Amino acid sequence: MAAVIAGIPQSSYGCAGMNRRGVILISMFLSANLRAAPPTLDLKLVANQLTNVTAITHAGDGSGRLFVTLQVGQIKIFNGSQVLATNFLNLGTLTTGGGERGLLSTAFSPGYATNGLFWVYYTRSSDGALAIARYSVSTNANVADPNGTVILTIPHPVGNHNGGQLQFGPDGYLYAGPGDGGSSCDLSGSTNNAQNLSLLLGKLLRLDVSNVSTTYTIPPSNPFVSSNGVRPEIWAYGLRNPWRFSFDRTTGDLLIGDVGQNAWEEVDFQTAGSPGGQNYGWRLTEGFVCGTCTNGCTNNITVTQPILVYNHSGKCSISGGYRYRGGAIPPLAGTYVYADYCSGEIFGATQSLAGTWSSATLTDTVFNITTFGEDQFGELYVNRYSNDVAGAVYRLIWKDTDGDGMPDDSEILAGTDPNNPNSFLRIIATGPSNADWTVTFGTVSNKLYRLERTDDLVVTNWVTVTNNIAGTGNPLQVADPGAAVETQHFYRVRLLP
């Protein structure tokens, strides 16, 4: 068995580096498979009285602002301390919020700091069609020019399954995720929209919006750009309601939370650099199950299977999220964070070295969650969806019950037992500017320990500081003369057999 440090608690963005004399508490747990247990998370209220939040994002302009999209057709700005009274944008009568319709997403140009451009995704109040429109900021940085340009409309026959996500990929193209058209079983198979490549419903679209003199152009690398009878905007297909998808800001991988029918919710995956063209299966498959809405599957169709599924036992609808790449919760690094709308549970999915995915509950809430958001630093936010003043935005934080600045995972617990995989030990790492780093940790008599260090948390980069450390039943202090000063370090202690 091994005791593995989960990470370094921090009170600011970025990884903790000891540039002055100080103490860091590092959580440690016992694990038979050497994998980190999920951190204990909590939610910190950052903005309230926000009715029916549908999306949370940032502009990438260094301002630190969050832009909160409301279903009724408004975009609000949270400036770090308060929600500004004046709307950033108000679509007015262009859209009407209700059910699954309304203003659903906002995406800012990668060059927003200089060009001031952003795009919105909404359902048109006149006929329910899906609309993507381009807007720009006014001379006031906190107010948009109300005059926009619709770049794409998609007829949508039913009020649900509108999709709703807009996001720029690492390639600079704008991705959009319209749903399959609504009702159940893809309009009961009358048009089989998600598998019909002549339609844009039930797809992931990829658009080049860099030329503002036109609406959009087709990226030449789109998979169906040369196929007759196929809409060239299509990047992937076979999706039911890809309500939320996101790109991993570190790897560029794409993760799609696709809302299921009556049995299975799923997360679909696409590696960075993929040529596109994936068929994610709907309505031939739901999750891993073939034939939910059809009489079996067609043998000559290749379906890309989801990486994760969960059933409807107490749950109903996935709200896709992000892979965590912030600095405030190191043990959450690389974890795909998502939720279920009905249960209010927030989950974390991790990928093993072998490539398989597994999921665990990170925290449970008492409210409906429709969306996650990522700020410019990679910290994650989640909404409380409500049609009254209870609507709010929260930031995911490392739980700190007593408010002393140290997460609960780093606090010494009564009856701490290094042999109990549910127990935590207290570790103190001290990094003065003119001496060796030292690490202090609790021990048990007649047990042997090994102290290890890494500077980057890469699994293969752990080095042994000291081996065969004999436990005494009291805390031991071990020096690490090989650790550079003025540098961040991560430590773990292994309980040897």
Please tell me what each predicted stretch does.
Residues 3, 21-33:
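Bacterial N-terminal signal peptides
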Residues 63, 274, 333, 377, ...:
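Calcium-binding loop positions in Ca2+-binding modules
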Residues 356-376:
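Conserved blade-ending motifs and adjacent loop-strand segments that build the rim/top face
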Residues 36-185, 244-247, 252-264, 289, ...:
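Acidic, Gly/Ser/Thr-rich repeat motifs that build Ca2+-stabilized beta-propeller blades
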